[in-house]
Amino acid sequence: MTTPTLIVTPPSPPAPSYSANRVPQPSLMDKIKKIAAIASLILIGTIGFLALLGHLVGFLIAPQITIVLLALFITSLAGNALYLQKTANLHLYQDLQREVGSLKEINFMLSVLQKEFLHLSKEFATTSKDLSAVSQDFYSCLQGFRDNYKGFESLLDEYKNSTEEMRKLFSQEIIADLKGSVASLREEIRFLTPLAEEVRRLAHNQESLTAAIEELKTIRDSLRDEIGQLSQLSKTLTSQIALQRKESSDLCSQIRETLSSPRKSASPSTKSS
C-alpha cells in the first residue's frame, strides 16, 4: 500500500539580488545634464522657431548672426541626440535587469514544480508496484481456479463414464443437484475472465481495485465452499459405490453358492441310483 505523502510548502522565491550586476543609479551630474538637455531642447525649439520665421529677413540683414545661430542649433541638436541615445541604452539595461529578475523567479518556481513532479513520480512508481503485486496475486488465484476447473472436468469425465451405473444406484435428485452445482461452478468460472479484464482497466483506481479484490475474495471463498461440498459429495458417492459394489459382489457370491449347492446335492443321488 502507498504511504501517505507529506505536502511540503515551497519556500518563498529568493529576492532578486543585483550584487554582481547592480543597476547604476543616476548621479547628481547626470541629473544636471538631464535638466540642461530639457532646457536646451526648449531653447532649441524656440531658436528654431525664430530661425524659421526670421530666416529670410535675418539672412538679408545679418547673414553672420544667422550662420552662428544655425551652427548653435545643429550643435545642440547633435548633443541632445547623443544624450538621448545614451539614456535610451540605460533604460533598456534597467528593463533587461527587471526581466532577468522575473526570469529568475520563474526559474525558481519551475525547480519547485520539478521537485514536486519527481516526488509524484516516485509515489506513482510505488503505487504501480503495489498494483502489480495485487495483479500477480489475482492471476495466481485465477490459475488455481483453472486447475480446480480441470480437476472438475476430469471428475465429470469419470462421472460420464459411469453414468449408467450411477443411474441404477442413485436417485435422479442427487444427480440433478450435482449437475446444478457443476453448472453454477462453470458460470462463476466464466465470470472470472471478464472480471480480470475489468481489473486491468481499473488498475489506475486503487479504491475500486481494492473493492474488486474483496469481491474476488468473496467469490473465491464461495468457490472453496462449493469445492468442499463437491469433494464431500464425491467422497460420499465413492463410498456408496464401493459399498454397493461390495454388496453386489456378496450377493453374487451368495447366488453362486446357492446355485452350486443343489448341484452338489444332486450328484450323490445320481450315484446311488
From Swiss-Prot:
It comes from the Bacteria. Induction: Detected 12 hours post-infection of host HeLa cells. Gene3D superfamilies: 1.10.287.1490. Keywords: Coiled coil, Host membrane, Membrane, Secreted, Transmembrane, Transmembrane helix. The chain crosses the membrane at residues 41-61, 64-84. Residues 1-20, 253-273 are annotated as: Disordered. The keyword Cell membrane does not apply. This is Inclusion membrane protein A. It comes from Chlamydia trachomatis serovar L2 (strain ATCC VR-902B / DSM 19102 / 434/Bu). The gene is incA.
